[in-house]
């Protein structure tokens, strides 16, 4: 259970911000905690802070034990062991990162026909809501994000809906949300069984294969994948690298992946191509990685575009070793050394300030750069092969003929 005080939202420099707020959460204690002191549990379960920090927080009431509906006083917590049915109550000072402002606060507040919370509605009935997700905002609560997420914003406008699939924070486009668990299950089943045709758009570096055969007109996008001679297929495996986790857990197993690509238009002055992308499998960052391996990364991809990447060691590894398990020169020790490089470059990109929150002493984070909150990758079409539904958004501005 979670209790949140009224939050304050404001916009600044193109960002939607939430002022830090207090959040109180409560849950029954875990079985492995029984018979232990609260301070010992906190130190062993949450190792990021020293023992002295948790002692101070217990005295301040940040962590409390509720027994038979009555909170134990801090002094008693130092000597009282945890019992079955105790409830741990935690009060935290939440610092949410800002997200990209997608509309004015006035537009966000007033729902007009075809819009909710400032998001364009593609389709809505009693079972589902389909919106055109803007880039720069997470779909659902994750990590430090909670209030600044699409599902929580929709709740403020009377819609409690579940996302049917994942769209990254910086990706835009079609987002199908189910208003009940049955609808969510049906759509997710279609996706898992590959009964769903998904087409994304991306703007990439260079002249993509077969782009010399396309006609630059507004209708070019409507004929994607009709001419099989223009299709490029990338079939290299996909794995993820998570520097926040220790090696070897942070390096996932390679999994087979297939993406088909089709050029739509070529912008000669910029030497960039808009391509349609049809992922047959659904691996994390699959389209982005496959485009990078083809030598045509997404133009503004700060992870997988070699011209602007903030993570050159990670990018080099992913492009050089499509299936890292098969490389004889990558033994456990070499992998550990390389993984440490991934960790180091991630730390170097952490945008921290030299100031601390006066209430909770959390290190303040610098505002993100607006350009880092947008990726020229857009979920454009979703179609159920049995004809149950077919949804499509307008072309994003960067894919339009007059936005070259």
Swiss-Prot record:
GO biological process, one term: enzyme-directed rRNA pseudouridine synthesis
Catalytic activity: uridine(31) in tRNA = pseudouridine(31) in tRNA
Residues annotated as the enzyme's active site: 168
Disulfide bond is among the record's keywords: no
Enzyme Commission code: 5.4.99.42
Matching InterPro entries: PsdUridine_synth_cat_dom_sf, PsdUridine_synth_RluA-like_CS, PsdUridine_synth_RsuA/RluA, RluA_PseudoU_synthase
Other facts noted in the record for this chain: Present with 377 molecules/cell in log phase SD medium.
Protein name stated in the entry: tRNA pseudouridine(31) synthase
Gene transcribed to yield this protein: PUS6
């Amino acid at each position: 259970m979670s209790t949140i005080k009224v939050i304050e939202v404001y916009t600044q420099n193109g960002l939607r911000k939430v002022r830090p707020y207090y959040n109180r959460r409560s849950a029954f204690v875990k079985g492995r905690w029984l018979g232990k002191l609260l301070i010992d549990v906190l130190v062993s379960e949450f190792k990021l802070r020293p023992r002295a920090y948790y002692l101070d927080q217990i005295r301040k009431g940040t962590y409390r034990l509720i027994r038979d509906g009555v909170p134990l006083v801090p002094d008693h917590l130092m000597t009282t062991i945890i019992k079955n049915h105790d409830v741990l109550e935690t009060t935290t000072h939440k610092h949410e990162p800002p997200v990209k402002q997608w509309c004015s606060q006035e537009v966000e507040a007033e729902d007009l026909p075809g819009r909710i919370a400032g998001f364009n509605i593609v389709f809505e009935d009693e079972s589902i809501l389909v919106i055109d997700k803007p880039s720069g905002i997470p779909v659902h609560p994750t990590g430090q994000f909670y209030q600044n997420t699409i599902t929580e914003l929709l709740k403020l406008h009377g819609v409690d809906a579940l996302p049917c699939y994942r769209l990254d924070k910086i990706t835009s486009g079609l987002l199908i949300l189910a208003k009940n668990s049955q609808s969510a299950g049906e759509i997710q089943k279609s996706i898992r069984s590959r009964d769903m045709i998904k087409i994304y758009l991306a703007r990439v570096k260079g002249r993509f294969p077969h782009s010399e055969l396309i006609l630059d007109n507004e209708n070019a996008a409507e004929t994607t994948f009709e001419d099989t001679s223009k299709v490029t297929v990338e079939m290299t495996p996909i794995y993820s690298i998570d520097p926040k986790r220790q090696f070897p857990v942070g390096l996932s197993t390679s999994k087979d992946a297939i993406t088909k690509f089709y050029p739509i238009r070529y912008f000669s002055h910029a030497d960039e191509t808009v391509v349609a992308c049809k992922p047959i499998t659904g691996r994390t960052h699959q389209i982005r990685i496959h485009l990078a391996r083809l030598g045509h990364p997404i133009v503004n991809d700060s992870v997988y575009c070699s011209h602007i990447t903030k993570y050159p060691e990670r990018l080099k590894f992913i492009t050089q070793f499509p299936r890292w398990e098969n490389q004889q020169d990558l033994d456990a020790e070499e992998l550990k050394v390389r993984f440490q490089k991934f960790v180091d470059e991630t730390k170097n990109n952490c945008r921290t300030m030299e100031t601390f929150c006066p209430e909770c002493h959390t290190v303040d984070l610098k505002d993100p750069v607006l350009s880092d909150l947008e990726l020229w990758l857009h979920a454009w079409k979703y179609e159920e092969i049995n004809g149950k539904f077919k949804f499509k958004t307008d072309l994003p501005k960067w894919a339009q003929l007059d936005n070259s």
